[in-house]
């Protein structure tokens, strides 16, 4: 007679296995197991073809309860332990048989993992436990700070999928992402991060220690690490090694080894050392690569951000050499990507606009268009004031807000005479609200209060429902206000949790001065705004009705963020990238009877629907322009997908359109092609390899 195991497999029923389990329970309880009792329990079981092993265990538990409760408890505990072990064994088997690391992951697949191996398995194996532990720690903190009721509400929000906590699967106590100041690195090297290296003294030691710095910092954060000063510091060491006039000696032979390298080749080798090292899997991150971001600046932006900066020796950055190095690195990196598939660094070009439809630094605006026309892929961040900076793929912050966050704080402690908090920022935690679910629940309440029935799985137009816009929007605002308020409390509790780790000396990056915790945000994530609009029958596109709907939601969150801001907690709002969240929320909502769009299988993370081919690039720039993004703090990057690369003049014109619309964060995407046979990489979308 066959029994069915928990993993679906079948095997022959074994009386001996059942007896062994009962004997083990008696042994655990410290009592003697009589053969007559053993036979009585096993003979009394009702076994039939295909019975589940869990049902057999239930019958044994009942029998033991009537005989010896102490042994019954031991039997239950033993089986619970074995159940977890069996579950992990099944997972290992499934993971080994998966096609890649992403499909093998059950809880939080990561795009930065390219290979499936024993290291990635080890990372995946305990994600479920980490999620449970993270929830236990945070609910305990919420209960102590607020109430048991709010702690239970947090779990209910997660369970009902109206709330999503990003990166719950990591080790408890990890902050999210960071843009560091590298100044402590210039003074102390890696000593304060537990290393033995002293401060770098030349270009060679700078590159080697910088790689270790980024890996060390990234090991204490779940997400990205941005180093906006990277090229400025590299230029400093090149000038120290080869003189202030090194641009006049780029073709001079400076390497006296048999290679006889010129200065420009030495610089290229330094680029290669750093970039290729950053694209290697990191053992301390479960074989992920580090998510590394850098920034470029035009001249007025650079002067606005780093105008008062001084190196430890009292010297100041030199724009002429830095400008050449920035441009040379972009050119080199673009060419290097024709030889290797290199994801990092994620680059952002920061340009200052003239407040209208053009740029203050015409040279850098032209160069930016030139790089796009040559097939390079990078972000562009626009501002009419150098008081804001996009330092990371998600975060856009106001430097004035950061400075004013703690007026009594001595900025020189962590900012080292820079006069701004431009690079020392980040997000400590991201919690995202499920907008489509929230809006549909609010609409249901609106119609219920008017005794109008709402069918599951249908949007408002499909049901022929009509509504008073002002009254319905009030329901939506009230629900979003309540949700935002709860998220702020949850995030404040998380903030206290990582402060506990900081006080215990567990977060070296903060203690070493690379980042001030009070300069990091607690982020309210937003996803699925187009799906929420479509549920109400609002056409997604550049029109007044959609703009009003968007601003109603985002302004409500923004007001709450400013209202709840404290000395230790600053809140911001971001459009979170699709990643896992957009697909998970879509599937969960569909399963629970909510309306989801039949045109896609995940929620949109933009202000438009990616599959909508009727929208032009100009319209998408309008939708990601100031009229729509003014209440957002980050994550609103426009990814303009193109079939083929444009000319320099065409890209330059699009940049002017972006400036005129206030589209402050954007990039252009063209599919690259990699030949599966010879490995040839093309910046163009090809059907046939030219080699």
Give residue ranges: language-model regions.
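Charged, amphipathic alpha-helical regulatory modules used
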Residues: 1-99, 516
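Catalytic-loop motifs flanking and including active-site residues across diverse enzymes
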Residues: 14, 18, 226, 522-529
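A structural signal for well-ordered alpha-helices, especially hydrophobic packing surfaces
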Residues: 68, 491, 530-533, 561
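Conserved catalytic cores of very large enzyme subunits
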Residues: 92-518, 539, 543-691
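Contiguous, well-ordered alpha-helical segments that form the cores/surfaces of helical PPI scaffolds
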Residues: 232, 522-535, 555
């Amino acid at each position: 007679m066959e029994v069915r195991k928990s993993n679906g497999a079948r095997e022959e029923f074994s009386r001996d296995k059942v007896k062994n389990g009962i004997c083990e329970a008696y042994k655990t309880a410290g009592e003697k197991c009589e053969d007559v009792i053993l036979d009585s329990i096993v003979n009394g079981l009702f076994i039939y073809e295909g019975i589940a092993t869990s049902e057999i265990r239930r019958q044994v538990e009942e029998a033991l309860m009537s005989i010896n409760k102490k042994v019954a408890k031991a039997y239950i505990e033993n089986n619970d332990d074995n159940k977890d072990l069996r579950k992990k064994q099944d997972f290992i088997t499934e993971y080994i048989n998966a096609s890649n690391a992403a499909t093998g992951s059950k809880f939080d697949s990561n795009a930065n993992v390219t290979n499936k191996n024993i290291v990635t398995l080890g990372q995946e194996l305990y994600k479920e436990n980490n999620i449970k532990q993270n929830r236990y720690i945070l609910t305990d903190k919420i209960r102590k700070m607020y109430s048991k009721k709010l702690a239970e509400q947090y779990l209910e929000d997660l369970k009902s999928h109206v709330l999503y906590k990003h990166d719950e699967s990591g080790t408890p106590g990890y902050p999210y992402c960071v843009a560091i100041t590298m100044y402590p690195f210039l003074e102390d090297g890696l000593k304060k991060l537990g290393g033995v290296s002293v401060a770098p003294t030349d270009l060679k030691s700078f590159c080697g220690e910088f790689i270790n710095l980024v890996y060390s910092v990234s090991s204490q954060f779940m997400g990205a690490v941005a180093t906006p000063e990277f090229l400025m510091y590299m230029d400093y060491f090149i000038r120290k090694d080869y003189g202030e006039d090194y641009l006049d000696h780029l073709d001079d032979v400076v390497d006296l080894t048999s290679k006889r390298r010129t200065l420009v080749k030495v610089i290229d080798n330094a680029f290669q050392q750093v970039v290729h090292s950053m694209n290697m899997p990191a053992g301390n991150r479960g074989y992920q690569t580090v998510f590394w971001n850098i920034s470029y600046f035009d001249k007025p932006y650079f002067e606005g951000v780093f105008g008062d900066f001084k190196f430890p020796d009292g010297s100041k950055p030199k724009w002429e050499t830095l400008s050449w190095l920035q441009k040379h690195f972009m050119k080199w990196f673009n060419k290097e990507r024709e030889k290797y598939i290199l994801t990092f660094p994620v680059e952002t070009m920061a340009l200052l606009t003239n407040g209208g439809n053009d740029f203050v630094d015409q040279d850098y605006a032209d160069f930016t268009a030139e790089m796009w026309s040559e097939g390079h892929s990078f972000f562009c961040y626009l501002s009419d004031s150098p008081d804001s900076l996009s330092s990371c793929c998600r975060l856009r912050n106001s430097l004035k807000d950061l400075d004013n966050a703690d007026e009594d704080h001595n900025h020189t402690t962590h900012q080292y005479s820079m006069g701004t908090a431009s690079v020392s920022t980040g997000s400590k935690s991201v919690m995202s609200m499920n907008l489509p679910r929230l809006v549909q629940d609010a609409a249901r309440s609106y119609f219920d209060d008017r005794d109008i029935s709402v069918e599951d799985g249908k949007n408002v137009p499909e049901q022929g429902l009509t509504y008073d816009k002002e009254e319905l929007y009030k329901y939506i605002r009230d629900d979003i206000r309540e949700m935002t308020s709860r998220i702020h409390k949850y995030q404040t509790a998380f903030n206290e949790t990582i402060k506990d780790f900081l006080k215990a000396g567990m977060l070296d990056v903060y203690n070493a001065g690379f980042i001030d915790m009070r300069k990091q945000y607690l982020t309210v994530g937003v996803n699925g705004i187009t799906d929420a609009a479509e549920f109400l029958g609002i056409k997604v596109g550049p029109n007044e009705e959609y703009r009003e709907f968007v601003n109603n939601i985002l302004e409500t969150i923004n007001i709450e963020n400013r209202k709840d801001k404290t000395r230790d907690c600053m809140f911001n709002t971001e459009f979170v990238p699709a990643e896992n969240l957009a697909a998970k929320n879509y599937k969960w909502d569909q399963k629970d009877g909510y309306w989801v769009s039949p045109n896609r299988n995940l929620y949109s993370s933009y202000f438009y629907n990616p599959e909508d081919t009727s929208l032009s690039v100009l319209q998408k720039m309008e939708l990601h322009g100031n009229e729509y993004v003014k209440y957002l703090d980050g994550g609103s990057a426009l990814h303009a997908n193109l079939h083929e690369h444009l000319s320099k003049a065409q890209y330059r014109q699009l940049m002017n359109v972006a400036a005129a619309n206030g589209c402050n964060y954007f990039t252009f995407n063209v599919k690259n092609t990699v030949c599966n046979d010879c490995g040839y990489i093309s910046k163009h979308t090809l059907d046939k390899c030219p080699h």
